[in-house]
Amino acid sequence: MTASQSSRVTFVLIVRIPVRGIEDFRAYEDAVLPLLPEFNGRLERRLRNADGTREMHIVSFASDADFQNYRNDPGRTAHAWLLERSSAKLELLPMTDVS
């Protein structure tokens, strides 16, 4: 593992979306996921179940500071109303690479 890999921070995001909120949740994701590279972030993997009510994302950032900057970015927070309106339940888990 290189030094740059060891300093990266990785998260798993598990999302539970009510059927009525799927459209708003996807609109939110369409707005905020493209911002990741601006903050040295990367969407490693995005999975969705067949009916669209569950998603799992694996995301990484070059540093915790980059992650915090992404979370606080006005371009991202401007779309928070879509996430709220979707009524999605999110679980964000910090992870460590063990391989």
Predicted regions and their residues:
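Short S/T/G/P-rich N-terminal loop/turn motif that feeds into the first structured element of a domain
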Residues: 1-72, 93-99
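C-terminal structural segments of small proteins and small subunits
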Residues: 67-68, 74-86
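Short, mixed-charge low-complexity intrinsically disordered segments
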Residues: 88-90
